[in-house]
């Protein structure tokens, strides 16, 4: 059984027991979270597609950890002008473990 849900403006395909990295959620580590924006649920040959969301579909998960991603560098450069601007960014994330999928 797997499902496709929406969180943080992105779509994720998950199955039970899977750990997935999402955009930062304001929920403490170890607490349960429930996603209700389910786009599709598939259980073998039985497939439910939402318009836009599946009625009564829920994904239960547990927050495993919070952290920051790898640093990326942003460089702005103007040729021949002795102008260079450099900036770094590290995006916050939340790791969640999927504990249950229900239709």
UniProtKB/Swiss-Prot annotation:
It comes from the Bacteria. GO terms for cellular component: cytoplasm; ribonucleoprotein complex; ribosome. Keywords: Ribonucleoprotein, Ribosomal protein, RNA-binding, rRNA-binding. One of its GO terms (biological process) is translation. The keyword NAD does not apply. The keyword RNA-binding applies. Pfam families: Ribosomal_L21p. GO terms for molecular function: rRNA binding; structural constituent of ribosome. Part of the 50S ribosomal subunit. Contacts protein L20. This protein binds to 23S rRNA in the presence of protein L20. Belongs to the bacterial ribosomal protein bL21 family. This is Large ribosomal subunit protein bL21.
């Amino acid at each position: 059984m797997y499902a496709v849900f929406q969180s943080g403006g992105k779509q994720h395909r998950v199955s039970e027991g899977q750990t997935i990295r999402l955009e930062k959620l304001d929920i403490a580590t170890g607490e349960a979270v429930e996603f209700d924006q389910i786009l599709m649920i598939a259980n073998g040959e039985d497939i439910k597609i939402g318009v836009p969301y599946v009625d009564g579909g829920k994904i239960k998960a547990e927050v495993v950890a919070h952290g920051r991603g790898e640093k990326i560098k942003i460089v702005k450069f103007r040729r021949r002008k002795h102008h260079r601007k450099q900036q770094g960014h590290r995006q916050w994330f939340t790791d969640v473990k999927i504990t249950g999928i229900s239709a």
